[in-house]
């Protein structure tokens, strides 16, 4: 069941859902607007030009209130907000249609697990022929919350728990199911 603004406000007041900082204008009928933070990360150039998924990838991190996203460029960014989801709530990240119509895509996994704590890393791609100026504080998407039928048996405790800033891939820490 997708949560209404009324339920979101109730959970925030009870502190069973934490979103900080949060302005009341961010709360929509069935979602919460998320804003762009001021941390951006790009993959550092590799001498081979190949990313090996078994090894840690190095990132260049930039802290700035403005970032110029070039045409066909990919950058990691972060939300301004920090989240703490209870163990019976999950969330979906959706990009804003108004920005998508300009060629700015939020290409993230789109899923926030129950029990997650941290800022959400956003994967941004500029599909436009023109550069796009990104500014910290701008609304870039929505978080849609869904209540689960029961509390998660194993809430999120993964490799991105507690992340702050534009956090690079930690795929090299994965173990594959055989």
From Swiss-Prot:
Chain positions recorded as dCTP binding sites: 96-101, 113, 121-123, 142, 156, 163
Residues the UniProt record annotates as site (Important for bifunctional activity): 110-111
Catalytic-site annotation from UniProt: 123 (proton donor/acceptor)
GO biological process: dUMP biosynthetic process; dUTP biosynthetic process
Swiss-Prot/TrEMBL keywords: Hydrolase, Nucleotide metabolism, Nucleotide-binding
Protein function: Bifunctional enzyme that catalyzes both the deamination of dCTP to dUTP and the hydrolysis of dUTP to dUMP without releasing the toxic dUTP intermediate.
Alphabetical list of HAMAP family matching this protein: dCTP_deaminase (MF_00146)
Family to which this protein belongs: Belongs to the dCTP deaminase family.
Name of the molecule in the record: dCTP deaminase, dUMP-forming
Phylogenetic classification of the source organism: Bacteria, Bacillati, Bacillota, Clostridia, Eubacteriales
